[in-house]
A protein has these predicted regions:
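Short strand-connecting beta-turns/loops that link adjacent beta-strands
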Residues: 31, 54, 74, 100-101, ...
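Asparagine-centered strand-capping/turn motif at beta-strand->loop junctions
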Residues: 96-97
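A short, N-terminal "cap"/entry segment at the start of jelly-roll beta-barrel domains
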Residues: 1-36, 41, 46, 116-132
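Short, conserved beta-strand element in jelly-roll/cupin
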Residues: 38-41, 52-69, 108-111
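A short hydrophobic beta-strand segment most commonly corresponding to one strand
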Residues: 59, 86, 100-119
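Short acidic-glycine-tyrosine-enriched beta hairpin
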Residues: 73-90
Length: 132
């Protein structure tokens, strides 16, 4: 996935960390950085972890459509417009569109000390298709 701020125009991106194409807008405010992602049906990212010695993590805000986020070992949580999810650092998770609906969300990285992202395995089609 490429992320560039280009006069607020979206770039369509495809990357090994994301299933399906997605429109991405770069967002930056003070020490926070993030993406607004427009995700078509079946689009979701891989499992990943936002590492940080202190602080860090990620905030998800559903802008439109319907999507999911899931923490490893827990049930997936449906996201609808206005929903806000705070994911602490060191939590393995994924997020993306519902299997049958378009989804747009802000994914904001919370500033942290020695922060980094670790991209892991894809969410299997079998697991993903179980979502309704």
């Amino acid at each position: 996935m490429r992320t560039k701020q280009r006069n607020n125009l979206a770039e369509t991106a495809r990357h090994e960390r994301v299933a399906q194409n997605t429109d991405v807008y770069a967002v930056k405010a003070r020490n926070y950085k993030g993406l607004q992602r427009g995700s078509p049906v079946f689009c979701r990212n891989n499992w990943h972890i936002h590492h940080a010695k202190s602080g860090g993590g990620q905030i998800l805000v559903c802008v439109a459509g319907r999507g999911y986020y899931q923490v490893e070992g827990k049930e997936a949580v449906e996201m609808k417009p206005g929903d806000c999810i705070n994911i602490p650092a060191e939590v393995k998770h994924w997020h993306g569109a519902a299997p049958d609906e378009w989804f747009s969300h802000l994914a904001i990285e919370v500033p942290g000390e020695n922060s980094s992202n670790e991209w892991l395995e894809p969410v299997s089609d079998e697991e993903y298709r179980k979502l309704k």
